[in-house]
Swiss-Prot record:
Its EC number is 4.2.1.9. Its cofactor is [2Fe-2S] cluster; Mg(2+). This is Dihydroxy-acid dehydratase. GO terms for biological process: isoleucine biosynthetic process; L-valine biosynthetic process. It comes from Nautilia profundicola (strain ATCC BAA-1463 / DSM 18972 / AmH). Gene3D superfamilies: IlvD/EDD C-terminal domain-like. Binds 1 [2Fe-2S] cluster per subunit. This cluster acts as a Lewis acid cofactor. Keywords: 2Fe-2S, Amino-acid biosynthesis, Branched-chain amino acid biosynthesis, Iron, Iron-sulfur, Lyase, Magnesium, Metal-binding. GO terms for molecular function: 2 iron, 2 sulfur cluster binding; dihydroxy-acid dehydratase activity; magnesium ion binding. Belongs to the IlvD/Edd family. The keyword Magnesium applies.
Length: 562
């Protein structure tokens, strides 16, 4: 066992002495040591109950002949950090989480890992950290929140509240309606109920095989979710106690190139958050998988979009996907397409393959999970656009487009999200404009803020089908409309988005994966020579360190290690 390095032999007497101080007995030094990476934090609705979940996991680990050691990571609630400089810290928190997993697991030579994340950057951060350690690892998340309902029964969620602010600004709803939205949208614990970033990532870790069947859709705070916790704990013990299984189920043996492909296939089929591209590129790098962004458009061409969930379809939430058969039903339906790129032979953590996991699955509600013969679209719900405005690519959630997929309009440029919010609310944006929000990339922000407030204002003001928005920042999973993010190179590194001027004509063609500004090569070269990027003042020391080390979005916004 890996943990023998800290517990076996006469020279480890001091180490054992410290372990005994925590309550370990002689017999415990013969057992595998299991790290329980929790992310309990009281301020996040998807995490305030995870302390109880960790107790369930640890109890099951002890019952199954192993020794659990719980430790915690930090967490940021993107919804609460939204719309102010707190959002600068959201994406950087992913790197702290990854570093903390790597640090605790390697410093103490733990044999295996069970991770309990749920929201936003916490799930991908834990996956990245687990890949660095490369021991057997199993993920069991806190689970999705139930959808909220208005007094008339209309289903709502957090995205409805954000858009409600825009409607209130425009005078379309009164203060009482906005208050009802605020009070009823989030009825209890769990990751926000739509296909936002948290639930997108939690379905993708199930698709990759490092979480058990049902992980992405079983609701939080239910007996079914508690049994999932116990099953995950039993399985990690079974693996850790067997030398052959320990080698077989190292996390890099599961998250390989096929698993990355499978994650993106499922992402396309369900129209997941555009943030998944950022996180999956980072995960691919940690897994030593060379994944080119151009591959996503190829995957999109071979993947039907068969499930729409809020914010793409506001009446459907994660509980509906679970009722309709869950992720296994989605994957089985995808596999029926003759040219699918879903790899059914890849391993899953419970043993066997993807094919074994989904063989008995069935779609129980074809209105929620459409049959492959009747998809929402024959191409996937995400696309990567390239052109002179984004030579290294940018991302759009095609599943959320509410208007035309081809757009030509005049640029209205803002050098920060706050500038954009002020411009939108003051009436500066009109039909046919392209809102450009720059210096919000990983380096320029720094921290790559989410642009949910500007996009929600645009939707709430009734301009969602008539205005495009492009940014080197990113979007909340709750964003919809013609919203294009992750523009690379970003403005802070001299990207074309930084050279744009008000009135420049921007052409977007989603179906041909292109985005360009209508300027001559001579004019572009002239602007490059005259260009000096803006460098923002930022609070604290961590963001300054982050800005020095972070790569752009096309590289997953990971930190340079060399």
């Amino acid at each position: 066992m890996r943990s023998d390095e800290v517990k076996k032999g006469w020279h480890r007497a001091p180490h054992r002495s410290l372990f005994r101080a925590t309550g370990l007995k002689d017999e415990d030094f013969e057992k595998p040591f299991i790290g329980v990476a929790n992310s309990f934090i009281e301020i996040i609705p998807g995490h305030f109950f995870l302390n109880k979940y960790a107790e369930i996991v640890k109890d099951e680990i002890r019952k199954n002949g192993c020794v659990p050691f719980e430790f915690n990571t930090i967490g940021v609630d993107d919804g609460i950090a939204m719309g102010h400089d707190g959002m600068l810290y959201s994406l950087p928190s992913r790197e702290i989480i990854a570093n903390s997993i790597e640090t605790v697991m390697n410093a103490h030579k733990l044999d295996a890992l069970i991770c309990i994340p749920n929201c936003d950057k916490i799930t991908p951060g834990m996956v990245m950290g687990a890949l660095r350690v490369n021991v057997p690892s199993i993920f069991v998340t806190g689970g999705p929140m139930r959808a909220g309902h208005m007094p008339d029964g209309t289903p709502i969620d957090l995205a409805t509240v954000f858009e409600g602010v825009g409607k209130f600004e425009k005078g379309e709803i009164d203060e009482e309606t906005l208050y009802n939205l605020e009070c009823l949208a989030c009825p209890g614990g769990g990751s926000c109920s739509g296909m936002f970033t948290a639930n997108s990532m939690n379905t993708l870790i199930e698709a990759m095989g490092i979480a058990l069947k049902g992980n992405g859709t079983v609701l939080a705070l239910t007996p079914e979710r508690e049994e999932l916790l116990r099953a995950a704990a039993r399985r990690i013990c079974e693996i850790a106690k067997d030398e052959q299984l320990t080698e077989q189920y190292r996390i890099k043996n599961i998250i390989n190139e096929k698993a990355i492909h499978n994650a993106f296939v499922v992402d396309m089929a369900m129209g997941g958050s555009s943030n998944t591209v950022l996180h999956m590129m980072a995960i691919a790098k940690e897994a030593d998988v060379d994944f080119d962004l151009h591959k996503l458009n190829e995957i999109a061409r071979h993947t039907s979009h068969i499930a729409k969930i809020s914010p793409s379809l506001q009446t459907v939430h994660m509980e509906d996907i679970h009722r309709a058969g869950g992720m296994s039903a989605v994957m089985k339906e995808i596999s029926r397409r003759s040219d699918t790129i879903l790899y059914l032979d890849n391993p899953v953590i419970e043993g066997g393959t993807v094919a074994d996991r989904i063989k008995d699955a069935e779609v129980k509600d074809p209105e929620v999970i459409h049959p492959i013969e009747n998809p929402y679209s024959k191409v996937g719900g995400l696309a990567i656009l390239f052109g002179n405005l984004a030579e290294e690519g940018c991302v759009i959630k095609t599943a959320g487009i509410t208007g035309e997929r081809k757009f030509r309009g005049k640029a209205v440029c803002f050098n920060s999200q706050q500038e954009a919010i002020e411009g939108i609310t003051s009436g500066k944006i009109k039909k046919g404009d392209v809102v450009v929000i720059r210096y919000e990339g990983p380096k320029g922000g720094p921290g790559m803020q989410e642009m949910l407030a500007p996009t929600s204002l645009i939707m709430g003001m009734g301009l969602g089908s008539d205005v495009a928005l492009i940014t080197d920042g990113r979007f909340s999973g709750a964003t919809r409309g013609l919203s294009i993010g992750h523009v690379s190179p970003e403005a802070a590194e001299g990207g074309m988005i930084g050279l744009l001027k008000d009135g420049d004509i921007i052409e977007i063609d989603v179906d041909n994966f292109s985005i360009n500004v209508d300027l001559t090569p001579e004019e572009i070269e002239k602007r490059k020579k005259e260009f000096t990027p803006i460098k923002k003042e930022v609070p604290g020391k961590w963001l300054k360190q982050y800005r020095m080390l972070v790569t752009n979005a096309s590289n997953g916004a990971v930190l340079r290690a060399e």
